[in-house]
Curated annotation (Swiss-Prot):
Task of the protein: Growth factor active in angiogenesis, and endothelial cell growth, stimulating their proliferation and migration and also has effects on the permeability of blood vessels. May function in angiogenesis of the venous and lymphatic vascular systems during embryogenesis, and also in the maintenance of differentiated lymphatic endothelium in adults. Binds and activates KDR/VEGFR2 and FLT4/VEGFR3 receptors.
Matching CDD domains: PDGF
InterPro entries assigned: CXCXC_repeat, Cystine-knot_cytokine, PD_growth_factor_CS, PDGF/VEGF_dom, PDGF/VEGF_growth_factor
Protein's UniProt name: Vascular endothelial growth factor C
Known tissue expression: Highly expressed in the lung, ovary, preputial gland and the adrenal gland. Expressed in the post-pubertal mammary glands.
Positions glycosylated per UniProt: N171, N201, N236
Positions annotated as Sequence repeat: 276-291, 300-315, 324-339, 343-358
Organism, scientific name: Rattus norvegicus (Rat)
Length: 415
């Protein structure tokens, strides 16, 4: 319940700060970051977090600073805001943030004094060793006729709030301090006696789980947070020029003040947007939206270039799809014209010329003692017209030269 009240108060304070303020000096910004405990090495926020019932409730209950709270609710916008702080301030937003090279944010929703005040108060109440005064007699259970002077001593004990109701602040390490006091016993039989007593001194603390005994006997019905941020029950109002109705804050807001909430006409199912779009992420060094995964123009390979809007590698010559010529088609994978011609078996395809060519030719057939047949792309041998029936001993008839030749000249007849 306290968390809901805090969120309502935070939203009211943020809405009250919609009037853009002056630019703060870099020194002031640096001091603010230091107060919030920001570091240059920011952990990766990952994808836009889904606002689903129990998961959201657990995250909200476990946050321990303004930085963590904003990172849970508005991960990308908050990262962009801190990036702008490190760059020396913020700028007025561009209404079309995804198309510009540099995403500019408005300062209206981020009143530094309010956030700093909340975070300072938050840090003061964290679970940690705190200097307290303890009653010596009660600490050790002294007899009623014995007391100490001074009656109290100063030691450190764990105290503060845990960020979840199921936890309590407990000490994880303890040291002991020796204190010298006067011990007085009545009736007085002797004067005050100096005594040295050791007191437990907590040196480190941690929020730890409570025992579940009571919860097993008495179930506590708690009202859960809604699965999504509450929508306004009232109908959308007609807002003046340059103002847009906001379903979450239930009022008209200036367009330039939209920083936590996206344009109503472009709401997604969960009501939140990635500030850089689905294919981009924030580069915290340059405060610009860049393609995810470190995709650069050099990553696309030959014949391709990087489309900075879609963050995809596209063909450089895609505008010339119809210039491939006959029997060629444009291949989207290689970004080149490839031959798609079908050739007969005896005329294999020449990919370079995209033509069906014969494997045999006149010269090849001549070397085989044959003639070239253009229609069939094959070599053939014309029959001998003067074939001799008998050759002299040691000679054999050659079908290639149509005469008798020495037998050892004759090659095996391949055909």
């Amino acid at each position: 319940m306290h968390l809901l009240c805090f969120l309502s108060l935070a939203c009211s304070l943020l809405a009250a700060a919609l009037i853009p303020g002056p630019r703060e000096a870099p020194a002031t910004v640096a001091a603010f970051e230091s107060g919030l405990g920001f570091s240059e090495a920011e952990p990766d926020g990952g994808e836009v977090k889904g606002f689903e019932g129990k998961d959201l409730e657990e995250q909200l209950r476990s946050v321990s600073s303004v930085d963590e709270l904003m990172s849970v609710l508005y991960p990308d916008y908050w990262k962009m805001y801190k990036c702008q702080l490190r760059k020396g301030g913020w700028q007025q937003p561009s209404l079309n943030m995804r198309t510009g090279d540099t995403v500019k944010l408005a300062a209206a929703h981020y009143n530094t004094e309010i956030l700093k005040s909340i975070d300072n108060e938050w840090r003061k109440t964290q679970c940690m060793p705190r200097e307290v005064c303890i009653d010596v007699g009660k600490e050790f259970g002294a007899a009623t006729n014995t007391f100490f002077k001074p009656p109290c001593v100063s030691v450190y004990r764990c105290g503060g709030c845990c960020n979840s109701e199921g936890l309590q602040c407990m000490n994880t390490s303890t040291g002991y301090l020796s204190k010298t006091l006067f011990e007085i016993t009545v009736p007085l039989s002797q004067g005050p006696k100096p005594v040295t007593i050791s007191f437990a001194n907590h040196t480190s603390c941690r929020c730890m789980s409570k025992l579940d005994v009571y919860r097993q006997v008495h179930s506590i019905i708690r009202r859960s947070l809604p699965a999504t941020l509450p929508q306004c029950q009232a109908a959308n109002k007609t807002c003046p020029a340059n103002y847009v109705w906001n379903n979450y804050m239930c009022q008209c807001l200036a367009q330039q003040d939209f920083i936590f909430y996206s344009n109503v006409e472009d709401d997604s199912s969960n009501g939140f947007h990635d500030v850089c779009g689905p294919n981009k992420e924030l580069d915290e060094d340059t405060c610009q939206c860049v393609c995810k995964g470190g995709l650069r123009p050099s990553s696309c390979g030959p014949h391709k270039e990087l489309d900075r809007d879609s963050c995809q590698c596209v063909c450089k010559n895609k505008l010339f799809l119809n210039s491939c010529g006959a029997n060629r088609e444009f291949d989207e994978n290689t970004c080149q014209c490839v031959c798609k011609r079908t050739c007969p078996r005896n005329q294999p395809l020449n990919p370079g010329k995209c033509a069906c060519e014969c494997t045999e030719n006149t010269q090849k057939c001549f070397l085989k003692g044959k003639k070239f047949h253009h229609q069939t792309c094959s070599c053939y041998r014309r029959p001998c017209t003067n074939r001799l029936k008998h050759c002299d001993p040691g000679l054999s008839f050659s079908e290639e030269v149509c005469r008798c030749v020495p037998s050892y000249w004759k090659r095996p007849h391949l055909n």
